[in-house]
From Swiss-Prot:
Region (Disordered): 44-87
Name of the protein this chain belongs to: Large ribosomal subunit protein uL4
Keyword Iron-sulfur: no
Pfam families for the chain: Ribosomal_L4 (PF00573)
Source organism of this protein record: Agathobacter rectalis (strain ATCC 33656 / DSM 3377 / JCM 17463 / KCTC 5835 / VPI 0990) (Eubacterium rectale)
Protein's GO biological process: translation
PANTHER family, per database record: 50S RIBOSOMAL PROTEIN L4, LARGE RIBOSOMAL SUBUNIT PROTEIN UL4M
Keywords: Ribonucleoprotein, Ribosomal protein, RNA-binding, rRNA-binding
Function summary: One of the primary rRNA binding proteins, this protein initially binds near the 5'-end of the 23S rRNA. It is important during the early stages of 50S assembly. It makes multiple contacts with different domains of the 23S rRNA in the assembled 50S subunit and ribosome.
Amino acid sequence: MANVAVYNMEGKEVDKIELNDSIFGVEINEHLVHMAVLQQLANKRQGTQKAKTRSEVRGGGRKPWRQKGTGHARQGSTRSPQWTGGGVVFAPTPRDYSFKLNKKEKRAALKSALTSRVVENKFVVVDELKLDEIKTKKFVEVLKNLNVEKALVVLNDMDEKVIASAANIPTVKTTQTNELNVFDVLKYDTVVVTKAAVATIEEVYA
């Protein structure tokens, strides 16, 4: 099992904990991680794009001029794609881009993502994250003490003061253990997680 330091909000090491290898020490499956990220991005797509083909554009039923003798190139309709106001070739239509990964694959992908952060020393454990008031400046100070900037902050419980304090920091996202996902883990440079959240993750995914 990997030993990692536990820091307080001042950035001082106060403890060490062992991480469960079945979650934080697995063999990294890059293909599954890739598929999990693709799934999240695909499921976000609206898929509402639409353009009209030549058969859907209004008008253009009459041949604009006779086939021969005008000196013009032959044309069958003013709604052909080469005409202004004509239809679109292979026009996009609404579609559903989403696809599914089974539960086992999702869990394996998340474990791989978490393991990669531990291996890269981008997994920071804090004993707790508590603020007396909603104060962005104070939260920035905590991050500075921990030597992190672009971070995913994983909380065990909904802490409104911490969440509100981090809301205006564009390089930080707060989440809870039940909302943890591969995309967020990889998007942010560092995962900052409370000691209680680590225990919950190990309880759920072990």
